[in-house]
């Protein structure tokens, strides 16, 4: 997973995710831990069946980690998640996902003795995925991201991803609506995102992508966003002045991260 800002797409989050299936069956639950490597954002969520595929598709990871199997073949559900995300799979040792080992990895990463301060429980299945992801990042990322003792100094504490605040768009709908990429070429050019993308900062470009992939469902939040847009429509001089002020602003999220 790339971390050099000069090689990254400034309009997309640079996400690596770890998935762990916690139940058997096609509609079984699975947990995911994901990190935006260049900014340090670190979140966990749980979903089942089609919902998980939809979440993975919207998240758009560049790499998906999973628990290695004895025969070296990824389980069918993991393969479906790979297809939804359109990213490569990486098998990781079983022990990195084991609850006790994963808890120890998380505690050591943040130099704490309990997860209570993060609002997490040591029995939370998502900690297994979180520990495996941290271990992988420690092994693969640049020493420049470390704290000098094997820890990732830029990685924020994990938190539960808030679910239910946006419209669920399944992977097939994301493709057919051509929200982010066209069906014919698989490229951004020609998609809805490319038509609307007029943001002048890298942070704005990623935010617009997020808004399109995670449409609001709360009426008050929708109206609040519309009111801001209306204010700029009524005052084009203000809009132009703001664009001038923002033009040239560097990717602060990745610089700070």
List PLM regions with ranges:
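Charged catalytic and DNA/RNA-contacting regions of genome-maintenance
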Residues: 1-234, 240, 244-257
């Amino acid at each position: 997973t790339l971390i050099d800002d000069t090689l990254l797409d400034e309009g997309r989050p640079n996400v690596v995710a770890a998935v762990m299936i916690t139940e058997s069956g096609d509609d079984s639950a699975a947990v995911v831990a994901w990190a935006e490597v260049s900014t340090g954002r670190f979140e966990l969520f749980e979903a089942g069946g089609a919902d998980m595929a939809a979440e993975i598709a919207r998240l758009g990871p560049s790499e998906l980690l999973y628990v290695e199997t004895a025969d070296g073949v990824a389980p069918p559900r993991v393969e479906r998640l790979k297809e939804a995300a359109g990213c490569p799979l990486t098998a990781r040792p079983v022990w990195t996902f084991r609850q006790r080992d994963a808890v120890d990895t998380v505690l050591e990463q943040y130099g704490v003795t309990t997860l209570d301060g993060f609002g997490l429980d040591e029995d939370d299945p998502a900690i297994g995925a979180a520990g495996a992801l941290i271990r992988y990042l420690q092994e693969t990322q640049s020493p420049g991201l470390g704290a000098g003792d094997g820890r990732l100094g830029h990685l924020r504490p994990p938190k539960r991803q808030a679910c239910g605040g946006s419209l669920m768009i399944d992977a097939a709908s994301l493709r057919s609506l051509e929200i982010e990429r066209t069906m014919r070429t698989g490229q951004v050019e020609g998609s809805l995102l490319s038509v609307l993308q007029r943001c002048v900062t890298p942070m704005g470009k990623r935010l617009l992508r997020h808004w399109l992939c995670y449409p609001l469902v709360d009426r008050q939040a929708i109206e609040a966003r519309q009111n801001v847009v209306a204010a700029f429509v009524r005052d084009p001089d203000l809009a132009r002045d703001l664009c001038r002020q923002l033009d040239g602003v560097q990717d602060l999220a990745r610089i700070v991260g």
